[in-house]
Amino acid sequence: MAGTRVRPSAGPSTSLVPAIRVFDSQRMDPNSPATQRAFFGRRKGHPLRARQVALFNSLLPKLVPDLTKPAPADLRTLFDCPLDQMRLEIGFGGAEHLIAQAQANPRSGFIASDAFVNAIGKALVAIDDHKLSNIRLHFGDASELLDWLPAGALSRIDLLYPDPWPKRRHWKRRFIQDDSLKRLARILKSGGELRFATDIADYAAWTLARVLQSPDFVWTAEQASDWRQPWPDFAGTRYEAKAKREGRVPAYFIFRKK
């Protein structure tokens, strides 16, 4: 997600085996065929660099929530720093937005999910470079994480530039569906926000049509500039910059949990 559209990996890496013990049998070696399958079928990427491989072994096991155990009632206990609120980013791609938000909001805890090996690798490098203690990572299908998180635990969810699945026969694979909106609403606090950005007009319309019919959310926009302009605290991404260069106009939606 987050506009991450990458090419097939050159093949598996055996040097990652120690780190992969933190994952279940469905997600073994991050560079193996078993894990080259993303949310709804795309988890391909370039081979990891040496530093990323090292961080998969040394840092990632410290950041991964154990989904085989019940989630703590207070997610702040997953972190070693004082926090006021919890947020979720689904499909963080190059991690530019995630890292910028974590730096700007040190008292917010971030759980970030991505099914792409390369996205996890980039995030690990950035977390290590900036010595961030308020991020936890989930490597795999975001639906697993949505089912694990406790009700009303989050203040905000960011879903930025998810795969639009442009072919009509694939629309059922789009992240925004009636069922996924219910699942997102369950884990948001009352008054919490779902923020969604896309550069695909059809996906923007698709999302609005479903959210406006949802009993759980209200669209906060009062004028066109509210969704045509980035949010005041929005950190742009490389994918977004590329979309703008190619003439696509992003839409920025904020939906509030009732």
Q: PLM ranges: what are they?
A:
Residues 3, 7, 11-13, 17-21:
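A cross-taxon signal for low-complexity, glycine/charged-rich
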Residues 20-88, 96-103, 124-152:
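S-adenosyl-L-methionine
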Residues 93:
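Conserved glycine-rich SAM-binding loop
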Residues 116:
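Conserved SAM/SAH-binding beta-strand->alpha-helix loop
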Residues 176-190:
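A short glycine-rich, Lys/Arg-flanked "PGG" loop and its adjoining helix->strand segment in the class I
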Residues 190-198:
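Conserved beta-strand signature within the Rossmann-like core of class I S-adenosyl-L-methionine
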Residues 209-258:
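Class I S-adenosyl-L-methionine
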